[in-house]
Amino acid sequence: VVLTVAAVPFLSPAQQLGLRQRWSARLLKILGIHLSADAPFIGPGSLIVANHVSWLDIFVINAAFPTTFVSKAEVRGWPLAGWLAAKHETVFLRRGSRGHARIVNGEITALLAQGRHVTIFPEGTTTDGSHVLGFHGALLQAAIEARAPLQPIAIAYRLPDGSYTRAPAYDGDLSLLDSLRAIVAEPRILARLRVADPLSVTDTPDRKALSHLARDAIVAGIAD
């Protein structure tokens, strides 16, 4: 893993995304997680908005649609995870700072203008996957500025019989080790991505309205 990540700076953006996708798919296979996405691709330069259940979400989305993620700044200081995130072009956000949010919006806008996918988790935290919290819409401004599609994606984790499982949930005071134990205790988990119709920022150039529309689409995707 270390050697693979060390090679990332020497790869082209397309090669980096391909490597990220393959590495993520491999990790899911090791953990016994089967990925199901109901769309083969999404339009270039999309701002992906998704509900947030687990640390696995990043690998699930990357295995289907390689992307740059926006993460809270604290992650940068985490052992190994922070280093890996930084090497994979993660955009770090200092939560609670409006000034920094404007800077991050500028970074996201530039990436979208290059045709890159960027993913945010507008709930701002994780849940157990049974519901969706309210969305914070500040970072949706980047899609408006870049005139980029807003792509809602609902993440749901299910057992083979289709029933809900909270095994992948990384919420509360659960440690990463406890989370891993819960995941591997299940012989097979289905990570399901429901890709909603993209939202046009031209039709709805308002962050608050876009937030509500994106959340409604994700709630519907989880219930499906």
What are these regions (language model features)?
Residues 1-11, 18-21, 39, 44, ...:
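Membrane-interfacial terminal anchoring regions of lipid-handling membrane enzymes
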Residues 2-17, 28-31, 43-98:
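Catalytic core of membrane glycerolipid acyltransferases/transacylases, capturing the structured
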Residues 45-47, 90, 117-121, 149, ...:
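Residue-level preference for the first positions of well-ordered beta-strands
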Residues 72, 93, 121, 153-155:
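Generic beta-sheet signal
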Residues 80-82, 130-205, 212-213:
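A cross-family acyltransferase "interaction/gating" segment
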Residues 91-112, 117:
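A membrane-cytosol interface segment of integral membrane proteins
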Residues 111-140:
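Catalytic-site beta-strand/loop segments enriched in glycine and acidic/polar residues
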